[in-house]
Amino acid sequence: MSSEVTVTEHLLLQQQRAPQATGHFTSLFHDLILSAKIISRSVNKAGLLDVLGGTGDINIQGEKVQKLDEFADKVLLYRMERSGVLCAMASEEHAELIKVSAAFPRGDYILIFDPLDGSSNIDVNINVGTIFSILRRKPGKTGDVELDEVLQPGSEQIAAGYFLYGTSTMLVYTAGQGVHGFTLDPSVGEFLLSHTDIKIPDEGFIYSVNEGYWDYWDTPTREAVMYFKQPSSKEKVRSARYVGSLVADFHRTLLYGGVFMYPSDNRKGKMHGKLRYLCEASPLAFVAENAGGAATDGLYRTLDYVPLSLHNRVPLVIGSKKDVEAVANIYAKYK
């Protein structure tokens, strides 16, 4: 472990390499990291505090709101609105775009996040995480941010990543120049560089998909899953792994290689996919590509997609480049 390098030092080093940098991005990350530390503390004490279970509310996604979901969302909104570098935010838990109040300084960054991905698993102590995406508002724009400024393709992201709350708390992020991982050392309260320039293997031996939905899939999706049940090109038998927490399944795929799939199916509301583009599919696709991997909707590149709404859902196939391409080749036969 490169324990001598903190995330702040790493960010400042990156800032020095960019002559046009103003320090606003580093400031944004500082507040984002502080928010994650607060969330991590509550996640680690979840069994001892009154933060397990649901609130009784239903969010914009039609999902039951968990107490920790609500807590994480409030922490991020409170801390980030006061960062002085944002002009707007969007959260999985809110129907509308959240504009930074005129009572606070505003910048030109837009933060989009899923405050606690996988929160339905928190009661059984499964890894959860915070996924984030950072955009910059369009040049020349002033005043309140409009929705069209947020509906950008993933290729326009300034940075993206996630915090993973598990046996340890990790930050994995990219600003378009490599993917780096940091592990929180609770004894000093700092994220320390633990994974430098992460590269996903070209081909993996793990496929991850919820096969409980087999009866609801179309023919190309079934064929793709059957493909991964066969030995790989290296004649190695693949293993199936599915946690059910997107950020946990993706993190394993990033480090070990393979493919994670969340395809569309013919259930009500899932015909165009389930994962939210702006706060789930797009940021993870940005991480995957910067680590040498790939991400598609099964056929087309995820980062090229232009979302139509704040909570636009899409299918996702993400992971090792060869494995994602194999799925695309199967889908192309049925195009």
Swiss-Prot record:
Subcellular location: Cytoplasm
Protein's UniProt keywords contain Ligase: no
GO molecular function: fructose 1,6-bisphosphate 1-phosphatase activity; magnesium ion binding
EC number: 3.1.3.11
Pathway linked to the protein: Carbohydrate biosynthesis; gluconeogenesis
Keyword set, alphabetical order: Carbohydrate metabolism, Cytoplasm, Hydrolase, Magnesium, Metal-binding
This protein's record includes keyword Magnesium: yes
Catalytic reaction annotation: beta-D-fructose 1,6-bisphosphate + H2O = beta-D-fructose 6-phosphate + phosphate
Main location per the UniProt record: cytoplasm
Positions annotated to bind Mg(2+) 2: D114, D117, E280
Protein's GO biological process: fructose 1,6-bisphosphate metabolic process; fructose 6-phosphate metabolic process; fructose metabolic process; gluconeogenesis; sucrose biosynthetic process
Subunit structure as annotated in this protein's UniProt entry: Homotetramer.
Entry-linked HAMAP family: FBPase_class1 (MF_01855)
Name this protein carries in UniProt: Fructose-1,6-bisphosphatase class 1
